[in-house]
């Protein structure tokens, strides 16, 4: 008798055919990778096909693969990853799509298929700079409207570019260049044989 994952894998291969770039299993979960050009149609099929019935998008996030595999990775930099749930069939699926252009990462919006994607896509736009084409209200959701850059990108500085503080003379919040100085972290060296009761 086939397991639930084997049944789901067979159903996905039958419904999607050549639109499957890869379909892998790890840690009891399936990950489906599709091309950006097929993304919207695949999502509709995942929701509407009676043998799949993924009624809910429960999460969507951006991923920056710039430093993945310590530089050994040589593929597209940005991806949108969705977690889908079929209540009807009691199974889950991870759906990944890579943005074809690293300079301006654009993928289709899933808001018209799963309305729950709305704020998730805004978050991925805000933090990674992923543009979701067709999104009804794609604007920042976590950072300030005047924020420069996308803070979850691997090339964004840890300390950021600007900081804000309250200026009592101007009686308002002002932005200024970051004043945090880089710290040099020196490891603690224990020089005594019985320091703190430790035996060496």
From Swiss-Prot:
Subcellular location: Cell inner membrane
EC number: 7.1.1.-
Pfam families, alphabetized: Complex1_30kDa (PF00329)
GO molecular function: NADH dehydrogenase (ubiquinone) activity; NADH:ubiquinone reductase (non-electrogenic) activity; quinone binding
Catalytic activity of the protein: a quinone + NADH + 5 H(+)(in) = a quinol + NAD(+) + 4 H(+)(out)
Gene3D superfamilies hit by this protein: NADH:ubiquinone oxidoreductase, 30kDa subunit
One CC-aspect GO term: plasma membrane
Keyword Transport: yes
Membrane topology note: Peripheral membrane protein
Keyword line: Cell inner membrane, Cell membrane, Membrane, NAD, Quinone, Translocase, Transport, Ubiquinone
Main subcellular location of this protein, as a coarse class: membrane
Purpose of the protein: NDH-1 shuttles electrons from NADH, via FMN and iron-sulfur (Fe-S) centers, to quinones in the respiratory chain. The immediate electron acceptor for the enzyme in this species is believed to be ubiquinone. Couples the redox reaction to proton translocation (for every two electrons transferred, four hydrogen ions are translocated across the cytoplasmic membrane), and thus conserves the redox energy in a proton gradient.
Assembly and binders: NDH-1 is composed of 14 different subunits. Subunits NuoB, C, D, E, F, and G constitute the peripheral sector of the complex.
Similarity annotation: Belongs to the complex I 30 kDa subunit family.
Protein name stated in the entry: NADH-quinone oxidoreductase subunit C
Organism: Burkholderia ambifaria (strain MC40-6)
Recorded name of the encoding gene: nuoC
